[in-house]
A protein has these predicted regions:
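Charge-rich, low-complexity N-terminal segments
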Residues: 1-121
Length: 121
């Protein structure tokens, strides 16, 4: 049986979008309470009854988020000089894919109403 599961992670960060016009509100430094959905897919392990232990996903994602993104200015993170949701989701994919077999998508929730989903290279 093929399944997909997701785990949501949260972090706080500031950013500004340097490519938008100076009068655009996102050109100014501002912050978000980001939520990140990390989804993996694959065949259910019939013996265990699951695809993967959620703790295994957490052990990969949480240290990276806390060390590299939480309470940071995302513009200062190498590779995120223009930290749109689209760029952030791709950046996360590149960091996580080598460590999460079956990675299916990364969804970045910038607000409760605005999100971007990236499904791989």
């Amino acid at each position: 049986m093929r399944v997909e599961l997701s785990r949501t992670f949260r972090f706080e960060a500031a950013h500004r979008l340097p490519m938008v016009p100076a009068e655009h509100k996102c050109h100014r430094l501002h912050g978000h309470s980001f939520a990140i959905d990390v989804s993996v897919e694959g065949e259910l392990d019939e013996r265990m009854g699951w695809l993967v232990d959620y703790a295994d996903i957490t052990s990969v994602v949480e240290p990276m988020l806390l060390q590299e993104l939480d309470h940071r200015n995302l513009n200062d993170v190498p590779g995120l000089e223009n930290p749109t949701s689209e760029r952030l989701s791709e950046w996360l994919w590149r960091r996580l894919a080598p460590h999460l077999p079956g990675l299916a998508s990364i969804t970045v929730h910038e607000t409760c109403a605005a999100r971007c989903t990236y499904r791989g290279l």
